[in-house]
Amino acid sequence: MKTIHRIFKLAFSAVILVALLPAKPARAQDLAAVLAKLDTAAKDFHTTTASFEFDTIQTDPIPDTEKMTGTAYYQRTGSRFQMAAHITHDNDRPAAKAYIFSSGVLRESDTGKESDAKSYTQAGKYESYLMLGFGASGHDLEEKWTIKYLGTEKIDGITADKLELVAKDPAISKNIPKVTIWLDTSRAVSLKQVFDEGEGQSRICYYKNIVVNQPLPGNAFSFNK
């Protein structure tokens, strides 16, 4: 018991000492360095393929979780941006859903078939938000978000820069009060994203097996016939 008390005292003393240390002024410098790295990496960003897991978590009023897994594709050619999410499993059950954003139009199909696809032409104004963490430069982020640097964390063995983002557009921040992303800044890609949607709901996106600047499948941005 004495040993346990001694450990607690040492730990508490360490916390007090840390609290008394002057705050590091490096956060702003660290953020500037991260954004500069993203600016550099974004210039060389063309394509990304990644396996993903999207978890929708609800804590209120009734706890619930939905998990979707599949493959995501991103492509940036000059000012043109395309992305697609092909869902293969929904709550561990086989699925064939697909979401495709191209030429400013978002299309979705619950069956993955072209004939069942629905189009949303107003999605183009949110293009810069869809680029979040995949080819977006530091300038792109600063233009749309108020950014706070939260340090680094290991994600799947990779040292990731953690950023907290609050949208400058009130229409966005009303629906998504806060976004936290973990970035591999050397490649301008996200390893993890957490969207706080308020009212007890959040979405967590995990990305693995990330391949950058390699040819994409010919059907990456197409539905099945």
Predicted regions, residues:
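N-terminal mature ectodomain segment of secretory-pathway/periplasmic proteins
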Residues: L31-S109
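A short, amphipathic edge element
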Residues: D30-A33, G138-L150, C205
